[in-house]
C-alpha cells in the first residue's frame, strides 16, 4: 500500500481512503453532492454557506470531464483519438492539457507509468469481475504498441503515431479532476471543502474550526470499510493504491 500527499495522483487504481468521523465542524453544516463517473463514486463536500450552486457546477464539471476523458464511451474525445487509426484529432484544451501531463509523467517515470498502456491492460478485461488471463503471445503483441513517445501533440491536435496505440487516462484523470475542482472552488471563494474521487481525497483548507481532516486508510481486503490507520491533512491530498481492488 502507498500513501502519498500530492496534487495529481498517478495510480492505476485509486481507492481505500475515506473521511473518518469528526470531519465536519460544528458550524456551518456541510453540504455534499455525489455523482458516479469513471466507475467511481465521487463525493464533494463543502463547509461554506450558500454552496448549493457551486456544488451543482462541480457535478456538471465531473460529468463533462467523464464525457471527454472516458476511453470506453463512444463519442468521447479519448475514444475518438484511440479509434482514429493514427490520424490527427483536434481535442479540447483540457483534454490536451491532461494528455500532455500524462506524457510528461510517463517520461519522468521512464515508461514505468505510461498513458498508452490500454492495449495491454485491455487483455485482462479488468471490468469483468472474473477477469481474463491472456497468453504470452497476446501480451508481447500488446506491449509492442505501448510507448508514450508515440503521442504527438501540436497545439490542440493530438496524433498517435502507432495506429494500434491507445491512451488510457485512468491513472491520472482523477487527480487532475480533483485539482481542477479545487481550483474552481477557490475561484468561488470556498475555503473549506473535501473532494473524494474514489479514494483520491483532496482537502481545500481545513475544517471550519481550522483543525485537520482525519482521513482513514482502508485495511486491505476488509469488507466493512475498517481503517488500518489514518492521516490528518489540511490543504493536501491523500491517495492510496493496492492490489485488493480493481
Language-model features: locations:
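Mature catalytic core of soluble alpha/beta enzymes
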Residues: 2-246
Amino acid at each position: 500500500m502507498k500513501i502519498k500527499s500530492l496534487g495529481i495522483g498517478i495510480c492505476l487504481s485509486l481507492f481505500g481512503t475515506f473521511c473518518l468521523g469528526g470531519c465536519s465542524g460544528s458550524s456551518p453544516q456541510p453540504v455534499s453532492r455525489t455523482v458516479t463517473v469513471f466507475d467511481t463514486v465521487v463525493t464533494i463536500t463543502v463547509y461554506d454557506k450558500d454552496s448549493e450552486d457551486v456544488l451543482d457546477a462541480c457535478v456538471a464539471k465531473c460529468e463533462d470531464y467523464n464525457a471527454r476523458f472516458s476511453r470506453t464511451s463512444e463519442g468521447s474525445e479519448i475514444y475518438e483519438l484511440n479509434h482514429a487509426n493514427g490520424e490527427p484529432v483536434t481535442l479540447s484544451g483540457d483534454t490536451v492539457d491532461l494528455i500532455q501531463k500524462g506524457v510528461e509523467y510517463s517520461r519522468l517515470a521512464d515508461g514505468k507509468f505510461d498513458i498508452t498502456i490500454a492495449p495491454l491492460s485491455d487483455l485482462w478485461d479488468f471490468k469483468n469481475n472474473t477477469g481474463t488471463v491472456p497468453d504470452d503471445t497476446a501480451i508481447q503483441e500488446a506491449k509492442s504498441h505501448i510507448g508514450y513517445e508515440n503521442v504527438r501533440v501540436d497545439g490542440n491536435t493530438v496524433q498517435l503515431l502507432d495506429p494500434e496505440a491507445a491512451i488510457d487516462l485512468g491513472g491520472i484523470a482523477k487527480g487532475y479532476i480533483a485539482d481542477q475542482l479545487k481550483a474552481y472552488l477557490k475561484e468561488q471563494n470556498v475555503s473549506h471543502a473535501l473532494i473524494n474521487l474514489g479514494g483520491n481525497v483532496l482537502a481545500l483548507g481545513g475544517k471550519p474550526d481550522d483543525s485537520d481532516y482525519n482521513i482513514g486508510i482502508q485495511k486491505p481486503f476488509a469488507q466493512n470499510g475498517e481503517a488500518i490507520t489514518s492521516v490528518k491533512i489540511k490543504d493536501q491530498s491523500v491517495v492510496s493504491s493496492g492490489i485488493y481492488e480493481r
